């Protein structure tokens, strides 16, 4: 027997049933996708789909060459034909904006876009953190005021309500100011942290030289006291940034959305400015962040487009659904409405015709394949979870009848005229 080939570590199959080490099912995932589709439409967002492979330079320019994502986590390879450096996308915003700039999508009006799909990072796999993971992203492009900042947070809170997990999530916010304000804060922060360089861990020493703001994001408990006493970016904000942040918070207050101000919230990507935020939970262990985002007013220009202030966020689907599966609610309709079975010569073809007719009327029908006994077929019907069983036997072919069985026992088994099949099932379903 040939040796089995296993999936790549940290990249999961999505099956119709739960797995030992990955509890999410394809049906649960599909129900979430359907919910997201309806949710985005209610806010006027249009879907965009981009390739999973991009030129590496896109992420170097947008995310930042010195970030952990670009420096350590991307899957990068060379195209064999022209040695062009390519990478599997580690996040969705850069790809979305590349497409917007390339196709001149902002030429006459702002845009509200959303995407959903797989991302890739070379990380140590653990619960809620995978090498292939999936995100839903929201991007509001060409909007400058704090009103859009508040709207997309209200939008995310609305989704948490729909999924039944609002009470398990906490909103943290901060302002990163503009480029000049961050530069002034960076100088003060470097001066402060340099005094404690001998106490920093190796990762923080590296960040001190490449992206000192990320030192404040450390999870090392030995560095918390140092970081808590560090210069705060909020103290370097100018009047315009302060006003934007104050109006943003006032809108959240007016919407009744509770939040915590976290001056150490910086996000992991270099393109953020002004408003940043995260939705966190204490129900998933170390992987506390379920959703995060912020403003990236200079990124479209950085990628070759005309200046367009913008804001967006992304949520990790795996983490989110782990939370929903344990604490929330999501209606999953994986079972068919009808399990169609047959017995005797000629009944197999006729049951196909009935099944097709029912599907045309909106019923989900699973048709039995093979020629087992009626008892065995009925067992499969029961295992399928179908609400109704349709039985076509040879002796019913001549007189044009079928047998219907309500698997929940709400109706007695009946033999009905084939012409009344759809109406009878519809009445039973609506009863």
Curated annotation (Swiss-Prot):
InterPro entries associated with the record: aa-tRNA-synth_II, aa-tRNA-synth_II/BPL/LPL, Anticodon-bd, Anticodon-bd_dom_sf, His-tRNA-ligase, HisRS-like_core, HisRS/HisZ, HisRS_anticodon
Top enzyme class: ligase
Chief site of localization: cytoplasm
EC number: 6.1.1.21
The UniProt record lists the keyword Cytoplasm: yes
Catalytic activity: tRNA(His) + L-histidine + ATP = L-histidyl-tRNA(His) + AMP + diphosphate + H(+)
One GO location term (cellular component): cytoplasm
Gene3D superfamilies: Anticodon-binding domain, Bira Bifunctional Protein, Domain 2
Keywords: Aminoacyl-tRNA synthetase, ATP-binding, Cytoplasm, Ligase, Nucleotide-binding, Protein biosynthesis
Organism domain of life: Bacteria
GO molecular function: ATP binding; histidine-tRNA ligase activity
Subcellular location: Cytoplasm
Pfam families attached to this UniProt entry: HGTP_anticodon (PF03129), tRNA-synt_His (PF13393)
Signal peptide: none
GO biological process entries: histidyl-tRNA aminoacylation
UniProt xrefs under HAMAP family: His_tRNA_synth
Family: Belongs to the class-II aminoacyl-tRNA synthetase family.
Quaternary state and interactors: Homodimer.
Protein's name according to its UniProt entry: Histidine--tRNA ligase
Source organism of this protein record: Neisseria meningitidis serogroup A / serotype 4A (strain DSM 15465 / Z2491)
């Amino acid at each position: 027997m040939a040796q089995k080939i296993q999936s790549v570590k940290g990249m999961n199959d999505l099956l119709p049933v739960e797995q030992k080490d990955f509890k999410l099912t394809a049906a649960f995932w599909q129900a979430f996708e359907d919910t997201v589709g309806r949710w985005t439409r209610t806010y006027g967002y249009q879907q965009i789909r981009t390739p999973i492979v991009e030129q590496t330079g896109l992420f170097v320019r947008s995310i930042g060459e010195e970030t952990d994502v670009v420096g350590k986590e991307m899957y990068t390879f060379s195209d064999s034909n022209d040695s062009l450096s390519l990478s599997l996308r580690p996040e969705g915003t850069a790809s979305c904006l590349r497409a917007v700039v390339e196709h001149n999508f902002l030429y006459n009006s702002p845009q509200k876009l959303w995407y959903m799909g797989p991302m890739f990072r070379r990380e140590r796999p653990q619960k809620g953190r995978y090498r292939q993971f999936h995100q839903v992203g929201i991007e509001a492009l060409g909007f400058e005021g704090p009103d859009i900042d508040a709207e997309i947070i209200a939008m995310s809170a609305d989704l948490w309500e729909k999924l039944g997990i609002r009470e398990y999530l906490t909103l943290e916010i901060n302002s990163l100011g503009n480029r000049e304000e961050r530069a002034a804060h960076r100088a003060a922060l470097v001066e402060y942290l340099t005094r404690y360089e001998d106490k920093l861990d190796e990762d923080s020493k590296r960040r001190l030289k490449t992206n000192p703001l990320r030192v404040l994001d450390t999870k090392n408990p030995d560095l918390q006291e140092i970081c808590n006493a560090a210069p705060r970016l909020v103290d370097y904000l100018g009047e315009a940034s302060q006003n934007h942040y104050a109006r943003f918070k006032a809108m959240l207050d007016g919407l009744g959305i509770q939040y915590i101000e976290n001056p150490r919230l910086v996000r992991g990507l270099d393109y953020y400015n002004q408003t940043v935020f995260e939705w966190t939970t204490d129900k998933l262990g170390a992987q506390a962040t379920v959703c995060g985002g912020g403003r990236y007013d200079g990124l479209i220009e950085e990628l070759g487009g005309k200046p367009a202030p913008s804001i967006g966020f992304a949520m990790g689907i795996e983490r989110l659904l782990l939370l929903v599966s344990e604490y929330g609610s999501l209606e999953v309709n994986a079972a068919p409405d009808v399990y169609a079975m047959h017995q005797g010569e000629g009944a197999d073809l006729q049951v196909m015709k009935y099944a097709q007719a029912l599907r045309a009327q909106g019923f989900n029908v699973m048709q039995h394949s093979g020629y087992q006994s009626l008892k065995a077929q009925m067992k499969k019907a029961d295992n399928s979870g179908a609400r109704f069983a349709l039985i076509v036997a040879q002796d019913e072919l001549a007189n044009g009848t079928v047998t219907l069985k309500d698997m929940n026992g709400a109706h007695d088994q009946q033999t009905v005229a084939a012409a009344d099949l759809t109406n009878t099932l519809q009445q039973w379903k609506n009863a």
